[in-house]
């Protein structure tokens, strides 16, 4: 039973590492990258191109990205510097 739990724990860790993190794309000022007036599919392309993410979508009004590499910064409420 202990080995089974260890195995499951390792699989969960691998999934977290391989999938990457997720979050809102940021602009050069540290604000969420707006998709308010962008065409459909814009955020998916932006996330893949600029953040090297696996996918993205417009979580109105900002681009939200999935599978972002750990070395790429995404918007975070705790470290928000937008407009400051």
Curated annotation (Swiss-Prot):
Signal peptide residue numbers: 1-20
One Pfam family, short name: Toxin_3
Secreted among keywords: yes
PROSITE patterns cross-referenced by the UniProt entry: LCN_CSAB
Top-level taxon of the source organism: Eukaryota
Disulfide bonds: 31-82, 35-58, 43-63, 47-65
Any one cellular-component term (Gene Ontology): extracellular region
Record-annotated membrane-spanning stretches: none
Subcellular location: Secreted
GO-annotated molecular function: sodium channel inhibitor activity; toxin activity
Tissue: Expressed by the venom gland.
Keywords: Amidation, Disulfide bond, Ion channel impairing toxin, Neurotoxin, Secreted, Signal, Toxin, Voltage-gated sodium channel impairing toxin
Residue ranges of every copy of the LCN-type CS-alpha/beta domain listed in the record: 21-83
UniProt PTM comment: Contains 4 disulfide bonds.
Role this protein plays: Beta toxins bind voltage-independently at site-4 of sodium channels (Nav) and shift the voltage of activation toward more negative potentials thereby affecting sodium channel activation and promoting spontaneous and repetitive firing. This toxin is active against hNav1.3/SCN3A.
Comment on protein domains: Has the structural arrangement of an alpha-helix connected to antiparallel beta-sheets by disulfide bonds (CS-alpha/beta).
Other information: Negative results: does not affect mammalian sodium channels Nav1.1/SCN1A, Nav1.2/SCN2A, Nav1.4/SCN4A, Nav1.5/SCN5A, Nav1.6/SCN8A, Nav1.7/SCN9A and Nav1.8/SCN10A.
Family according to the record: Belongs to the long (4 C-C) scorpion toxin superfamily. Sodium channel inhibitor family. Beta subfamily.
Name of this protein: Toxin Tf2
């Amino acid at each position: 039973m202990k080995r089974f739990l260890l195995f499951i724990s390792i699989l969960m860790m691998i999934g977290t590492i391989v999938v990457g993190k997720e979050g809102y794309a940021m602009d050069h000022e540290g604000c969420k990258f707006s998709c308010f007036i962008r065409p459909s599919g814009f955020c998916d392309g932006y996330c893949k191109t600029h953040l090297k993410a696996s996918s993205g979508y417009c979580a109105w009004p900002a681009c939200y990205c999935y599978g972002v590499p750990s070395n790429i910064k995404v918007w975070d409420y705790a470290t928000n510097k937008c407009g400051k």
